Regions:
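Hinge/lid segment of periplasmic solute-binding proteins
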Residues: 41-53, 122-173, 322-329, 395
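Extracytoplasmic/periplasmic solute-binding protein
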Residues: 161, 165-169, 174, 199-247, ...
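Mature extracytoplasmic/periplasmic domains
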Residues: 73, 81, 134-135, 304-311, ...
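Glycine-centered hinge/linker elements that transmit conformational signals in sensory
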Residues: 202-203, 246-278, 327
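C-terminal capping/gating helix-and-loop segments adjacent to ligand/active sites or protein-protein/ligand interfaces
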Residues: 398-459
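Extracytoplasmic "Venus flytrap"/periplasmic binding protein-like
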Residues: 81-150, 159, 181-193, 289-298, ...
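A structural signal for short loop-to-beta-strand junctions that line the ligand-binding cleft
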Residues: 108, 115-116, 145-182, 214-215, ...
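Extracytoplasmic/periplasmic substrate-recognition and gating elements
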Residues: 80, 84-85, 90-92, 162, ...
Length: 461
């Protein structure tokens, strides 16, 4: 890679000491939301479009989402209830699992034939509507959606190109989950709370349970998130500027983070990628026999994924499923929270008033009692209260979300989740960690591969 990139060379030369005043800081205390940008303060918000009105005649809407079976069922039940209450509105759903979903929706956004109401990933606002051309500014629909039910910081994270392009359905972050049934078999009775605990668990698993048992498995993208978590814990600065995606770390610091992940592999803490892929291919961890039977006894996953992983365990291991603690690898609280998903209205929608009414119903109104925590703990205050009153908030998800939100303090930039970086099998993160595991390379050996890939998607490195 060329050494002419000024920001990268600057950080190399200063060792980040002279640059400290220029870098975003995190870790000193938890933040209510750590994906918020300053965008919302750049221009006044659009006012409600007073010309919007609900139709008395028949209206057809379409909606799309991704997820698992339980989410599909919740959405469909909520849509049935909505249509019963609004007898002139028919809602046609389109839904599937995540695999291949972004590619399908990207094509639809480009072609201008996406559904009227879309469940969106936060970074889609930047990837597909950075100029505000794909999604309606929901400030114009505020006659029909009570936008005051969301915290300003969470709303700001969805404010792109001077437009409130979606409302946040939920906020999420990563946390450890452990199968204490297996940990107990290894003679460990408490969840890991430090790096020393992790390394001791790796040794105990290998010695007492055998080479086939591991405290944890992390795929390539999971490893990248944990690496960033580790670096933020140690250095107290965001991985990158949350608005400009200017990287805040030197090559040496990143190589250190990569070596941290390698030390977990070498210490039998996490299963080597060749071992996992040899048995499961690209299959999801919760669907692997190793997870189901307790041979993999831990993960580092989104707080909203708790139920999925617990439900996948066999009857022997299910009782041991435990929400762990965030691990402080340094002097700071590392890790980020982000908008888990949002709800947007496409600009091709012919009935934005009805579309906004549907969003209001699902996330602020009676539909929230049906949706519960299927899309995470609701970010809407009214939606959360409604779901709680209905007893529809999963206790594990709520516990995990509470631990995440009270700990993490760093900000996420919009390029971190670029599909060119995180795609399973083909992304740069995959290439980097495959090279470490398959070829036994050090962090210093692969840091340029990571930085080149980040630069290619728009990072200033």
């Amino acid at each position: 890679m060329s050494k002419a990139i000024s920001r990268r060379n600057f950080l190399m030369a200063t060792g980040a000491v002279g640059a400290a005043g220029l870098l975003a800081a995190c870790g000193s205390k938890p933040a209510a939301s750590s994906t918020a940008s300053s965008a919302a303060s750049q221009a006044p918000a659009a006012s409600a479009d007073e010309s919007l009105a609900l139709s008395d005649g028949p209206v057809s809407l379409s909606i799309s989402w991704w997820g698992g079976d339980s989410r599909h069922a919740a959405y469909q039940s909520a849509l049935e209830a909505f249509q019963a209450e609004h007898s002139n509105i028919t809602v046609e759903p389109t839904f599937a699992a995540w695999s291949g979903w972004e590619e399908k929706m990207a094509a639809a956004f480009i072609a201008g034939n996406a559904q009227d109401v879309c469940q969106v990933n936060w970074n889609w606002l930047y990837n597909y509507s950075a100029d505000g051309s794909k999604f309606v500014d929901l400030n114009t629909t505020s006659k029909f959606i009570d936008l005051t039910q969301w915290d300003a910081a969470a709303m700001d994270a969805c404010y792109v190109a001077n437009s409130q392009q979606c409302v946040p359905v939920s906020m999420t972050g990563r946390i450890f989950y452990w199968n204490m049934t297996t940990f107990n078999k290894a003679g460990i009775t408490e969840v890991p709370k430090s790096l020393d605990d992790l390394m001791a668990a790796g040794k105990a698993f290998q010695e007492k349970l055998g080479d086939d048992y591991y405290p944890m498995h992390l795929g390539a993208y999971d490893r990248m998130i944990l690496m960033v978590f580790y670096l933020e814990s140690k250095y107290g600065k965001d991985w990158a500027d949350p608005v400009t995606s200017t990287l805040n770390y030197t090559e040496d610091e990143i190589a250190e983070g990569l070596s941290f992940i390698k030390s977990l592999v070498d210490g039998h803490v996490i299963m080597p990628l060749p071992t996992y892929y040899g048995a499961n291919g690209d299959g999801a961890t919760h669907q692997s026999n190793e997870w189901i039977t307790g041979k993999i006894a831990g993960i580092f996953e989104w707080d909203s994924a708790a139920s999925k992983y617990q439900d996948a365990l066999d009857e022997e291991n299910k009782p041991g499923f435990t929400v762990g603690e965030e691990i402080k690898f340094g002097d700071y609280n590392g890790g980020f929270s982000k908008v888990s998903m949002g709800m947007a209205i496409t600009k091709t929608c012919k009935n934005p008033a009805e579309a906004a009414t549907l969003i209001e119903y699902l996330w602020n109104g009676d539909g929230a009692a049906i949706m519960g925590s299927e899309c995470g703990v609701p970010a809407s205050k009214a939606g959360l209260a409604t779901a709680q009153a209905a007893g529809k908030i999963n206790e594990l998800v709520a516990e995990a979300n509470g631990k995440v939100m009270s700990f993490v303090s760093c900000q996420l930039d919009p390029l971190f989740e670029s599909s060119d970086l995180k795609a399973t099998g083909t992304g740069i993160y995959q290439e980097v960690f495959d090279t470490v595991d398959y070829d036994n390379k050090s962090g210093a050996d692969v840091v340029d591969t990571l930085l080149d890939g980040m630069s290619a998607v728009g990072y200033t490195v």
